[in-house]
């Protein structure tokens, strides 16, 4: 169980700051991961998860009305391939996928409908998605 995320150095004029660009305060990629984690924590009630897909890590929470799933595909492989896996939701409805990668800054990427309480997700290496 992970109950805390610590970011070592978020001083705005520090070269170690991975949240904001030095001198301009423009958001860097690290900002969006920390923001998503904060949103997840604000929902309060964590959900049990299991995943047997290598290099895929996830966390989920709900407040009784809103559900959120955060999934990351992190790898150090020299030539990693995309990973495709099933996401079991338990209900049929539309889900919005927010993506953080080289081209996207945790913005809505696609809307997907679950079928029989599940859908298939493909992630590129070193990507984070939020599913709401």
Language-model features: where?
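C-terminal accessory region downstream of the catalytic core in glycan-modifying enzymes
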Residues: 88-111
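Flexible loop/turn segments at secondary-structure boundaries
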Residues: 12-16, 77-79, 104-106
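C-terminal beta-strand-rich structural cap/linker in extracellular carbohydrate-active enzymes
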Residues: 110-132
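Generic structural motif
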Residues: 56-58, 92-97, 119-122, 131
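Hydrophobic beta-strand segments of well-ordered beta-sheets in folded domains
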Residues: 3-5, 67-69, 95
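Carbohydrate-binding surface patches
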Residues: 52-91, 100, 126
